[in-house]
Amino acid sequence: PDRGVPFFFLRLDPAGNVSKRFSAAGFPFARYGGSCPRWVVHSAFATPGVMRVQVAQLPDGGTFLCFARSVSRMASSWAEPKPVHVIAMGCDIAHAGEVVYADGIDVTHAAVGIGLSCRLCDRANCRSRAFPPLEHRLALDPMTRGDSPYRFERTPGR
């Protein structure tokens, strides 16, 4: 029987700590370390209360409609900062037509390349990369400057 759109759900704090996550959509969350800085969940902190929408494409070609919004609660006292989190949800791009947040987006051309995390990502030209990938050897050349702070040689077969 048809049970509706399978979504994933994520809640994280400004430090990137994930406090809740569920996935019926097959989104492969990173188990350790931070997630990709190009993913919409991180930019949602910069626009409090505004729904941010992104078509995110993983290196393996998996593509997801993602939407995220920051939420805050009252502080427990005047001396405490307000707790802020981002709530993110998404679904496989095949279900985008069933989700209102895809309205007006050309999902076939709007994809932003993201990775699970910098250490697991094979995207060589990422300007947001914070760490080199674990599976590839660094290409150190003091005379060359690329898009990414970490140039690397692809490991054969990976």
What does each model-identified segment do?
Residues 1-158:
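Active-site hotspot residues in diverse enzymes, especially metal/ion-binding acidic/histidine motifs
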